[in-house]
Regions:
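Terminal, low-structured helical/coil segments at or just beyond the last alpha-helical repeat
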Residues: 38-43, 218-270
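Canonical tetratricopeptide repeat
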Residues: 91-94, 125, 159-161, 195, ...
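Register position in tetratricopeptide repeats
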Residues: 64, 98-99, 132-133, 149, ...
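Structural marker of alpha-solenoid helical repeat scaffolds
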Residues: 47, 81, 115, 149-151, ...
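Bacterial Sec signal peptide processing site at the extreme N-terminus
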Residues: 28-51
Length: 270
């Protein structure tokens, strides 16, 4: 079983999907276990736009703590004021995606982008949704559009997600270009560093792969299963049996139920 088979056998989730609420900013992180509500029905402010914004903000907080019913309640109140708010549609999409109602989620994402095609956060989340459904061609197309927005704060992560989509399509050269762009904007992006390590190793450049892995370890003191797998592959390619044994022990001890460990074990048994 070749290295490339191991790499391609693992579907790496796009970053925004891993975090789910990545594009909601730091809302969830700012919560301290409670959500501050407002009273007075929909009359939170004399300014309708401000009221919608507050309701959507509340909904995002509820999404951050997994309270889907209160999230939907606030979004419904916001929609009573502005039936065509892209922000409301997007937040509804995140709720439905989280509750496994994928048809509804997609409809809401599409509604958001129809109202405001320039809302890159919504497009990035929609692309992550498509990726989660295995619709990699569509995801790649949407992530590519997101990366074209030079003012989008999440652009470096969008390049990472673009690279991950291209990997799933077997477009390794194009994936490497996307990861390189991501690293030019954020040199400490652990996902891009890790995937570049795999790509360089597969290209036969063990030294560069080791450099990327070293940079990855500097950003991730506790390595992920995929990080340990890269360490294993580099050690194997370099003939470093001591390091290989060390990484194998770490992968077996820390992540015995991981896909990476199962794949490594299958490889050793062939």
């Amino acid at each position: 079983m070749s290295h490339s088979v191991i790499v391609q056998s693992l579907v790496v989730k796009p970053v925004s999907l891993i975090l789910l609420c990545l594009c909601l900013g730091s809302v969830a992180a700012a919560l301290s276990g409670c959500v501050t509500e407002y009273s007075g029905g929909t009359q939170m402010s004399a300014d309708p736009d401000a009221t919608v914004e507050k309701r959507v903000s509340l909904a995002r907080q509820y999404i951050g703590v997994g309270d889907w019913e209160n999230a939907k309640r606030n979004l419904e109140l916001a929609q009573q004021i502005d039936p065509n708010s892209a922000e409301v549609f997007e937040a509804f999409a995140l709720v439905y995606q989280s509750t496994g109602e994928n048809v509804l989620a997609e409809a809401q994402f599409q509604a958001a982008l129809q109202v405001d095609p320039s809302l890159s956060r919504a497009r990035n989340n929609y692309a992550a949704f498509l990726y989660s459904q295995g619709r990699f061609v569509e995801a790649e197309r949407e992530f590519k559009r997101v990366t074209g927005d030079t003012l989008y704060s999440g652009r470096p992560m969008a390049f990472v997600n673009l690279g991950l989509s291209r990997l799933q399509l077997g477009e390794k050269k194009e994936a490497e270009a996307a990861f390189t762009r991501a690293l030019s904007m954020d040199r400490r992006n652990s996902v891009a560093l890790l995937e570049m390590g795999f790509l360089r190793l597969e290209a036969g450049d063990t030294g560069e792969a080791a450099r990327y892995h070293s940079d990855y370890r500097a950003t991730a003191p506790t390595q992920s299963p995929r990080g340990l797998l890269l360490g294993l592959e580099i050690a194997r390619a370099a003939g470093d049996t001591d390091t290989l044994s060390s990484y194998e022990l770490a992968l077996r001890s820390l992540y015995p139920d991981s896909s990476e460990y199962r794949l490594w074990e299958e490889r050793q048994n062939r």
